[in-house]
A protein has these predicted regions:
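Iron-sulfur cluster-binding cysteine motifs and their immediate structural context
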Residues: 19, 212-236, 255-280, 339
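Short coil turns that connect the paired helices of HEAT/ARM alpha-solenoid repeats
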Residues: 311-315, 344-351
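Auxiliary alpha/beta "docking" domains used to position bulky ligands
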Residues: 1-132, 141-206, 254
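Alpha-helical adaptor scaffolds
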Residues: 284-318, 325
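Amphipathic alpha-helical scaffolding segments comprising HEAT/armadillo-like alpha-solenoid repeats
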Residues: 302-306, 333-344, 364
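A beta-strand-loop signature enriched in Asp, Gly, Thr, and Trp
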Residues: 234-254, 265-298
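Structural detector for internal amphipathic alpha-helices that build alpha-solenoid repeat scaffolds
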Residues: 321-331, 353-362
Length: 364
């Protein structure tokens, strides 16, 4: 058994574990990783300081996998479709309703559900290598035959870059990974391994001359093809941004209250994206087009109960209420004015500021 045989073994394992796509990339200094330090230096990462983490050699960890794992030789990339049969954000109705990003509708935090499946692939990889110790060419004296690290959006690796070079999809002009058959509604899981496996060919870029994602972005966060300024991105503003949202960006946020799907909703490759039948990715009750009044005045107890095990808990109750109040300001519906007025007196300055802004907007 060789590196090709192992690759041929783990791909069916990924399929049986529930993944839709699986590919293998070598560990290299890809051009996109070379651009990453420049992107950070230009301030495009906003307040996401964790992206600036550096290794002992001073290099950005996410730009150089070898600086974190000197033994790394290959990366197994698995992708799973989370799309569901619900309307897109570009077509949702009702001014008193908000929008939560499709990935956050799920009944279980995707980190947990995807990692659980990824562990099955990792176990099969280890089993195959341990049964064929000659494959462990990089093993050091006294080291295990195979070293692995598995991550779902939590490790020191730019997953989508490795996904491209694993042939799973190409990087679109909206910076999302796009697969020709599945579209871009994909969760990624990666396994970094010390074993050199047969790599797949990179996926060709099929965006062509299309710029629909760039044209559709309300806050102009896509400053150039394949280039995102997170400071302007609605997903960043509603999830990662702490404190108040810059006033000049609030109107562009529309009624997005957690994340944003616009640049994916308008992508032609998602027109025929299949819907997942996996139970854990189906929408929780009330999260598709949620009532803005409910979100703005949700109690701490209700927030914890409703979003236990959900990625929405990342924004915290204060952030979600802030987002809902900005959405109320953008709704144009004066029936929501009492909510803005009540919350303008809230002791949380982030909430009261958003509510006061909403009042002003509704009076226009």
């Amino acid at each position: 058994m060789n590196g090709h045989d192992i690759a041929d073994l783990i791909k069916p394992t990924a399929k049986s574990a529930g993944f839709d796509l699986c590919g293998i990339a070598p560990v290299r200094n890809f051009p996109e990783l070379g651009r990453f330090p420049e992107w950070i230096a230009e301030g495009y990462a906003g307040e996401m300081k964790y992206l600036e983490s550096r290794g002992e050699n001073g290099k950005l960890r996410r730009a150089s996998l070898h600086s974190v794992f000197p033994w790394a030789r290959s990366v197994v990339v698995c992708a799973i479709n989370y799309n569901t049969a619900h309307p897109h954000s570009t077509g949702f109705n009702g001014p008193t309703r908000g929008w939560i990003s499709r990935y956050a509708w799920s009944r279980e935090d995707y980190h947990d559900s995807v990692l659980r499946r990824l562990r099955q692939v990792e176990a099969k990889l280890k089993e195959a290598v341990c049964a064929n110790p000659l494959l462990a060419t990089s093993a050091r004296s006294g080291a295990p035959l195979i070293e692995t690290r598995s991550y779902v959006d939590t490790g020191p690796i730019v997953e989508r870059v490795y996904a491209k070079y694993a042939g799973v999809g190409w990087l679109g002009k909206n910076t999302c990974l796009i697969n020709q058959k599945v579209g871009s509604w994909l969760f990624l899981g990666v396994i970094v391994t010390s074993v050199e496996l047969a790599a797949d060919l990179p996926a060709p870029d099929r965006c062509g001359t299309c710029t629909r994602c760039i044209d559709a972005c309300p806050t102009k966060a896509l400053v150039a093809p394949y280039e995102l300024d997170a400071n302007k991105c609605i997903s960043y503003l509603t999830i990662e941004k702490r404190g108040g949202v810059p006033e000049e960006l609030r109107e562009g946020m529309g009624r997005q209250v957690f994340g944003c799907d616009i640049c994916q909703d308008v992508c032609p490759w998602n027109r025929k994206a299949p819907a997942s039948d996996k139970p854990e990715f189906q929408a929780r009750e009330g999260l598709v087009n949620p009532a803005l009044a409910w979100l703005a005045e949700m109690s701490e107890e209700e927030f914890r109960e409703k979003f236990r095990g959900s990625p929405i808990k990342r924004t915290k109750r204060s952030g979600l209420r802030r987002n809902a109040l900005i959405a109320i300001g953008n709704s144009g519906d004066r029936s929501l004015m009492p909510i803005a007025e009540r919350n303008s007196l809230d002791p949380d300055p982030v909430v009261s500021d958003a509510a006061s802004w909403a009042k002003q907007q509704l009076l226009k």
